[in-house]
Amino acid sequence: MSRLGRIIVEAVAHTYGRDEVLRRLSHPFWFQSFGAVMGMDWHSSGITTSVMGALKRGLEPVRWELGIHVCGGRGRHSRKTPDELKALGDRLGIDGAQLTRHSRLVAKVDSAAVHDGFQIYLHSFVVTDDGNWTVVQQGMSPERKLARRYHWLSEGLDSFVDDPHAAIAGMPHETNIINLADHRAKQSRDAQVELVNAGPDAVLPHLHMPLHHDVRSGNVVMSRLRGALTAAANRCPVDFTELLLTRGVGQRTVEALALVAEVIHGAPNRFTDPARFSYAHGGKDGHPFPVPLKVYDKTISVLRGAVDAAKLGNDDKLAAIKRLDREARRMERVAQTGISFDELIRRERKRSADYGGRTVFGWAKNSMSASAERKAPAKNQESAQLSLWSDAVVR
């Protein structure tokens, strides 16, 4: 995960700039799609910790070159955030003390000003050389077996206590909560230190997600997926000649690349069905199918070559990946019929072993039925992973 995550971030930064990386990490739909295309369980609390952990590890070797730094993390790592930010400020010549104050205030708002029953256990602070930042936090409610993710973005942030979130992703609360960061809590804030000002914020779109973790046809906008697959089948012969000459690149790799290309280049409204991106590399829990390691490694190889060439001034391969995304959009408008989602998943499961399919439960085997494709986890294993959303609301 760390290798693929690093390459995608490098591609976004090279094409659109470092600040665009921050904007995308603060967008819950893109974040979920990013995790899914990396092979994470598309519908669990683990996607947040895994994505941020993978980014911190993956970007470490190139962070000074790239100018993007991931501080903090889960549990004890979150408590190291102030020291990491101060050290970063000293090296870059930016105000590390102010960044530390922002980090603490963000953590304090979500843990002390928002009383929603979720205890914060992850705090990841991503900052650029320019001092711009985004924060991804996650809290858990063990009693309800649910998690909630909080997104912050420094760009356009006027107040830390007046509807400051870029988004909050989680299940709607059944009971009343105390949210002192809501603009309607002005009278209460006026009586407390550092809680000032009030004002309305724009209403963000809603993302509704089910309780089940398996990927079903209803979770996917099939026209979008079919467009990507059709573009892969057509191979974009004029634009993709050089890419397709890469040793080992076949139709399945191009299918995965088409979805990765959309994560790099897609507009925000393209990420309303994040489950679709799990088709690129499956999921480590076996949903919708085991991670095809051969395809996964080839995707990394192609992207790595494209990004490295772009750093040397040759953008042809990176531009070719962008054209694949554009071709998928075009085919989406015309490829309205074809293989169904269920048939597509059955096909991937059937050939999973040929692609080096693997889950956290072991390697995929030939001639497996869909129901027996992976060993069922024990009850204590199921309870160890919290559900991120159930009819989730992003607000």
Tell what function each PLM region has.
Residues 1-212, 326-334, 345-395:
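Structure-specific DNA junction-binding interface
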Residues 9-14, 208, 236-237, 277-283:
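Short acidic (Asp/Glu) and glycine-rich catalytic loops that position anionic groups and cofactors
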Residues 27, 118, 221-225, 236, ...:
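Active-site-proximal structural scaffolding
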Residues 43, 255, 266-270, 309-316, ...:
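Intrinsically disordered or highly flexible coil/loop and linker segments, enriched in small
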Residues 215-224, 239-261:
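Helix-hairpin-helix
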Residues 228-233:
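Short, amphipathic alpha-helical "recognition" segments used to contact nucleic acids or chromatin
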Residues 251, 255-311:
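Phosphate-backbone recognition surface of nucleic-acid-processing proteins
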Residues 296-299, 303-334:
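Helix-turn-helix/homeodomain-like alpha-helical modules used for DNA recognition
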